Amino acid sequence: MHPFPDETAHLAEILQKLDAALQEADADVERIDTDYKNAKRYMAQYRGELDPHEMFQNELLLKQTDHTGTIAAASRDRLAKLKDSPYFARIDFKCDDGEEMIVYIGRFTFRCRGEMLIYDWRAPVSGMFYDYETGPAGYDAPAGRIEGYLTRKRQFKIKNCIMEYALESAANIKDDVLQKELS
């Protein structure tokens, strides 16, 4: 039995949401690819009949569709990378104003239905994982300095969607762990 059954259940829930997001991203990429091919086909088929203004509009549409496709493909690729190893850390932080946050930290941000599920390791709040032991902590948010108390720190090794280990840690994390997980 895993030492943190709540973490196993959380991982299963995150993987399910990542699967759904990945399917949606795949469908978006396919739709954009189809739109691009249809616009190209239309331009080739009616090349001699299009006036210069319509030709210009279609070329703009192609460029915009290509750009949108590039962004959609990059988003899909990030989701695919996250699915293999969604996150590598968790911190629980109680703000001085009483708000409690559970923050999972991974290579990329992941939101689902407006809820932040995984924070990018470069986000200000994520820095507490590396910079503080459990106890008084804080970070610089866009709205100003947030102070509070770091109540929990966990590290995870998730590979091929399987949690290989999870451990509780009170110490601040050294860069070798960061480099290993982000490589």
Label for each model-derived stretch:
Residues M1-L182:
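Extended, charged low-complexity regulatory segments
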